[in-house]
A protein has these predicted regions:
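Amphipathic, interaction-prone secondary-structure segments
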Residues: 41-94
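Charge-rich, low-complexity N-terminal segments
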Residues: 1-53
Length: 145
């Protein structure tokens, strides 16, 4: 179904915007906590959280990326889109997009892509996200791995 009236936009925003923005912030917090727990990552990777955005760097590979969040509609469903991007030659390059639904489903690349994770109960999201991010950066020739 598509958006047909202003209420199709305002009702989901009123009901779910704060929830989805909070979940996006929770994702960033969980990535930082995962990084802090994994001792092997500290020597080669830097992860910082600032203003509800995450910055990931691998200095030896000259890799740096940031995240940004936005709300978007898929049909009449409001979702949170978390994008990881980098810059090159004054241009932004999207590396990976992740999606969070109001039902707590988390996915990579598209809203319907598999696997779908349970955002609040699946503890494999963080390592999967780091893996997807580095594979996507490699596929786009941003890093070589």
């Amino acid at each position: 179904m598509s958006i047909e009236t202003i209420a199709d936009v305002t009702a989901p925003l009123r009901t779910y915007a704060a929830l989805l923005e909070g979940r996006a912030g929770d994702l960033h917090q969980s990535l930082l906590r995962y990084y802090e727990r994994e001792r092997g990552m500290h020597e080669q990777i830097s992860v910082k959280l600032d203003d509800n955005k995450i910055a990931i760097a691998i200095p030896s590979l000259k890799f740096y990326c940031l995240s940004r969040n936005r709300l978007a509609f898929v049909g009449k469903d409001l979702i949170a889109e978390i994008e990881f991007f980098t810059g090159k030659d004054d241009q932004e390059i999207s590396i990976l997009k992740c999606y969070l639904s109001t039902e707590g489903k988390f996915s990579f690349c598209s809203v319907d892509s598999e696997p779908q994770y349970d955002f609040y109960h699946d503890r494999t999201i963080e390592p999967a996200l780091f893996g997807q991010l580095f594979r996507a950066a490699s596929a786009k020739k941003i890093i070589s791995i």
